Each structure stands twice: as structure tokens, then as C-alpha cells.
Amino acid sequence: MAATLKSLKLVRYRAFCSPSAFGAVRSVSYWNVSSTQHGGQDPPEHISLCHSAKKVKNICSTFSSRRILTTSSAHPGLEFSKTSSSKASTLQLGSPRATGVDEEDVEVFDSFENMRVFLQLRPEYRVHSYNASETSQLLSVSEGELILHKVRVNQNNLQAQVIVDYLCKLSSLPAEQHPVLLGSTSFALLCQLSVKKIQLFDTQDLINVLKAFVILGIPHSHSMLDVYETKCCHQVWEMNMDQLLLVADLWRYLGRKVPRFLNIFSSYLNLHWKDLSLSQLVHLIYVIGENRQVSQDLMQKLESLILKYIDLINLEEVGTICLGFFKSSTNLSEFVMRKIGDLACANIQHLSSRSLVNIVKMFRFTHVDHINFMKQIGEIAPQRIPSLGVQGVMHLTLYCSALRFLNEGVMNAVAASLPPRVAHCRSKDVAKILWSFGTLNYKPPNAEEFYSSLISEIHRKMPEFNQYPEHLPTCLLGLAFLEYFPVELIDFALSPGFVRLAQERTKFDLLKELYTLDGTVGIECPDYRGNRLSTHLQQEGSELLWYLAEKDMNSKPEFLETVFLLETMLGGPQYVKHHMILPHTRSSDLEVQLDVNLKPLPFNREATPAENVAKLRLEHVGVSLTDDLMNKLLKGKARGHFQGKTESEPGQQPMELENKAAVPLGGFLCNVADKSGAMEMAGLCPAACMQTPRMKLAVQFTNRNQYCYGSRDLLGLHNMKRRQLARLGYRVVELSYWEWLPLLKRTRLEKLAFLHEKVFTSAL
């Protein structure tokens, strides 16, 4: 048996042209499902039907000469018996069809059929979709044996139409006999004859045979289906839209990816997309989503049709459209998403949980903040969550975090429902749920039970995390945002073995996540003695994040103006440093240092021009906010009071900057001497005479994406950054977007006064 299957993997199309090849064969399954799905492999781009037939002939002598199969009976055929059907029933069939489930268990359901509910809502769908519930008159066992006998006897004379008829009739055998049929060499012969005659099949023949294959559960990985895909490709331009959709649906039911057929189908659609009816449009979007294969140009055309039919689409179809666009990674415009949100809000109580989850997926993907829809979600989601499967709960939670939408009722319902059924979570579900709670910086009332159950599940799911390593850092960061640090898991995630695994096994670059975790542990877990990232990876992560942060901030005119105003107010660029105090937190800061007299220190060596390093005298550093100055500011008459003045002092020799004296994070070196209101920076003096800054300020230039939606509550990452800055002795000065951005439209003096108050009031 093993030798047979190995041989069948090497030969693309099997055929037993000589009856003697069957003489020693009885009831052996040639249809075992491969452990590797076809979807994970690239099928050949071009397959010649004539070439396939030649392969069939060449295989005949090979299998005739090899006595690789043995049995106790010399008579080939199909024995339909209770014993054989019982044994064969353990075989895994290839078709993802419905199975009986306990309706009370929300975690057990047929997701394949669940996504096809929309096909039952209009009679038009019956024309271009496959309905698994359709029944036909059953074929008796004796009639089936007779057909297989005719195949053996008349194999050289069977016509194409007869082959199609036989396949269709055999698919009407009782379901319990299907595995036995698949184990019959006579049925294998019939299938090979269909390959030889396939050039004579017309469109309807092709559809009927594919239906028979679906009913019988032909494994999706079987090489014979390559020939059928090629025939479908050749037949595309002979089919109408209904037939094309039906063929695509049948391939989906077989569970086989057919990229070549879909590419040609797309070409057909580019010419005929305007002719799509409503049912054809929705069904097409479903097919596209399930195959994850589409051109963006075609999807834009389909979006225009969605608008055309928007008032006729029902809620299940809305969910199907959202899921199709989501799975194909295609955006819907904000205008269409708002229309969809309006439709959902108008009948929110009648919206199925399935459609609700599909719609929130698309809102998450497009980041459209439909306020009324968000409010409605806050009202109905807590009632729906107990009846949702954990995957649905995960998508709902992730929607909330992606839109920064903190609704305590929703989050509490999620936290209450998960602990009893945490075993149903995949590693992905655990990761996304922990990330969502951490991102929203929210601890539910049952936080202890909630987090302990999820952390325990991470331990149980470790084999799964080895397969999908990207989910483990996501889990641990979500926990770290809320100050949970499971040491054993962190030690494993930062181990050289896991880091190497993460680099090799995932398409995602996890360096940023691992670097953020590593930096967080270094600050918040002083007693931690486990694994840390290598110095090389830390440096690489720091450089990457600084490049991204600097590029982002320097592209914002409002930020550049803020830097200039701070430099003007404090006395020059050497008093302000734009950098990442905590590189692992992914955002930059404007650092200011003050001495014991709350005067700014010129600590930024990088801002000092090389020609002026020898001697720098700065006068009038900083601005004292006196009553006289405030009067001038309010009257708008002050001019030039914020400009620092520099000049070289004669008789002084330049001093050399000594890099060896540098110290990390917060230990920036400077030489400060206060003489009659003037400050001198003459390079770096020995550490003994250095003046340590009394206060280090981290000026935060914030935006609305750092806060929960419609509130002033920081998100998890940014709250964690503030927490860590405080641990390192920094005082945060927040230039909040709701205060600072409107002020940018005011006069320069008003902006300077605001900055002065922020910086020096925070110091007090």
C-alpha cells in the first residue's frame, strides 16, 4: 500500500489500461488524502491534455509488470458489504461538506456551510451555486456493481457521454458506500478513462462530473484534478456567467485551489463585469474571498456594482461582501463602508452574529470609524458574545482595539465568557485577545481569573506557538502593556532558539516585537535573569525603529515647528535633543535637561557645530516669565527676547571632546558653569566637575492615535512608555494634540508662552 501511494505521487495521471493489472487487486484505496494540501503547492502552469493521455498509455506496462499489490481474491470488483463499508468509513474524504454537530456547542460548527447561508436567501443563487442538500434517487448496490462490471468489460469502447453518465450514477450510491467505491480499482479505471476522453466533454459534462466528484468526496490533492482544471481553463470562453460561477463553486466545494482557472475567469470578468446581476455579484465576491486571488482593478469595478445594488442587498449578503473583500485583502472605500454601516445600524437586531463578525472585520481592515455602528456594537455585543465562538469573540475584540474603541461592557463580556472555554482558543485567538486588552490598556473586573486562564493556555499551546511563532511575542506584549510578566514564557521567547525559529518560520519580521519585549523587561523586571536579545539584534532593532520614527516625525510640519520653537525659547538647538529615549517603545521624544536652578543645560553635543566646539558662551539662556514679559506677550510687542547670543571668549584654549566619558541613557555629559548669568560649554571636563541635571524632561508630542477613541486615556503602548520613563527618572511634558494643534494657528509669542509654561511649570 505504501509503495503504491509512493508510486502514485511520482506519476501524475494513473491509468490501468490492461485488465491484467487488476487481477491481483481488491478493494484497495487509491484515494488517500495527502497530508499536504494542494493549496500549498504551485500546480503546473500548462498541462496538455494530449500529453496526459500519453502518460496514461506509458503507465500501463509499468503497473502490469509490477506485482506490488496482493489480495486474497483474484476477482476484481466492488464488494458492497457491511464489513467493508465499516472499515472504509474511517477513510478521510476530501470534500469539506457539512457534518452533524451539536447545535448547543457554539464552538463546534461547520464553518464552510456557515459562510454559504446567503446562497439560500434568493432563488437566483440556485442557478450558479452547488447545493449539497439536493437529493437524487439512490442507486442500489447491485446497480453500482453492474456499472463497474461494464467499465471493466467495455473499457476500450466506452464513449465520453457514457463515462459521464456512469460517474453521475455512481455518485448516487448511498453515502456509506462512497469510501468503498473510492477503494475500487474499477472506479479508478473509470476515472482514468474520463481523463482520456475529457477533450470530448462539453461544458455540461464537465459540470456534471465535478458535481459527482464533490458528492463522492474525491481528495482535493489528487493529480487527476489537474487535468480537469486544465479542461475548465480551455472551456472558460465557452461558458456563460452562471456556469463559470457554478464551476468555481464546485472547485471550492472540492477544497482545491485552481489559480489558472481563476486567472482566466478574471480576464472574462474584466469584459463582462457590468452584466453581473445582484446574486452573481455577491456569489462572485464570495468565490474571490475564498480563493484569496483577485486583481485590485477588478475589485474596484465590483465596488461600483455594490453601490448600484446597495439598496437591494440584505444583511447576510452585506456580511458576505465584507468577508470577500476582507479575505482578498482589498479595501472598500470609506463611502461604501459608511453605507454598509448605515444598513447594519438600521436592522442591527436582525443582523446575524455571523454577518456581524464579518462586518466588523471589514471595519477593522479599513479603519473606518462609523460612530453610530460603534455605539450599536457597544449595546448588542455584550448580549451576543456568550453565543459567539471564540474566533468570533477574537474578531470582535480585535475590532475594538484596532479602532481604539474602549467599551467596558464589551470588554467585560469578553473577559467573563472566555475562561470557561479557553481550551477552544487557537494560539492566534489567545494572542489577539491579549493584544486587544493590552492595547486598550484595560483590566476587566475578573482580571485575575481572565489572565491566569489565558497565560495557562499559552503554556498548553507551546507546540502551536512553535508552528506559528509570530503569536507568542504578541501575547507577551499584550501582557506587558498591563504589567504582567510571565518570566518562563519571556525567557523562552527571547532565547536564541526561538529567535532563530521566528526568523526562519514566519513571513513576519518579529524583530520590532522582540526588541520591544526585550527593552521592556530590561526596565520593568530588574530581577529578571533569563535570556535577552543579543547586542547585535538590540542595535539592529534600535536603528530600525529610530529610522521609522525620525522619518515619521520629520514629515510633520507641526512637529518641526514645535522643535524650532523649543530651541528658540531655550536658547538654541543644543538645549533640545530629538531622539528616542526608549527606542523599544517605538516613538521619539524631545529631551530637555534642567539644572538645580531650573535653567536649561546645553547637553546636546550633536547640535553644536564643530567650529564652535572650542568655546561656546551662551547668554540669557532660558526665559523668566515676569509680569513685564507677560504684558509684552499679551500685547504682542515683544521682539527677539528668545534669541540666544553666542560668542567666543578670547584667551581660552579649545578642549577635546572625550567620547570615552559617555554614559548610557540619561547620563548625557556636559560642562556647565554658571558665571554671572552666562553659561559656558568648553567641551567635557572630568566627571568630578560635571554638573548633574536636576531634572530630565521628556517632551511628548502626541496625536489622537495614541489615545482611546473619543477620550484622553492613553493606549497600552504609550502608557507603558510613560511608566518606564518615570522609572528612569524622567518627567513627562505632554504637548497634547487637543491643546497644541489649535495653538499652532495662533501668534508665535502665544506659542512660546504656552511652551514656557509647560516646560517650567512641569519642573515645579
Swiss-Prot record:
Tissue specificity remark: Expression detected in spleen, thymus, testis, ovary, colon, heart, smooth muscle, kidney, brain, lung, liver and white adipose tissue with highest expression in heart, smooth muscle, liver and thyroid.
GO MF term list: RNA binding; rRNA binding
CC per GO annotation: mitochondrial matrix; mitochondrial nucleoid; mitochondrion; ribonucleoprotein granule
Primary localization class, coarse: mitochondrion
Residues with N6-acetyllysine modification: 507
Assembly and oligomerization: Found in a complex with GRSF1, DDX28, DHX30 and FASTKD2. Associates with the 12S mitochondrial rRNA (12S mt-rRNA).
Function: Plays an important role in the processing of non-canonical mitochondrial mRNA precursors.
Name under which the protein is recorded: FAST kinase domain-containing protein 5, mitochondrial
